């Protein structure tokens, strides 16, 4: 049987992670500063949380996430993440989002759209944000882990409303 065109698929009703770790090292690229997330050298530890209705199909992951917690080597922390989430090479979409990070809290719907995974390397210019947020607090020091240029800008920002655009050109 020819399986060369078979799409990789995993499905699970439920999954629980307790103190997991994910590490990715691109040996062809030097390590960036440790105070920002380096997508070529990820080291995510203390991963704990519950997942339901999980589907992994090709490069896409869909799941309901409950109380996900983790720490990235840069110092970025997710203190709590609850959401219905889709992650793929074209972006991340979250519904019913509650995200508590080092200093901020995001409630609502949030999406990041990209052309490819490599777009995250130029986060400010290439990642399109689209969010409907309720009673949220964005702290630019949290965003600085992805885009160091925004560190210490207008912090914190409390708001409810719709946000769209790249970080460099928010509307």
Where are these regions (language model features)?
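Elongated, acidic membrane-bridging lipid-handling scaffolds
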Residues: 2-127, 136-138, 154-157, 165
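Flexible, surface-exposed loop regions and adjacent strand-edge segments
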Residues: 147-150
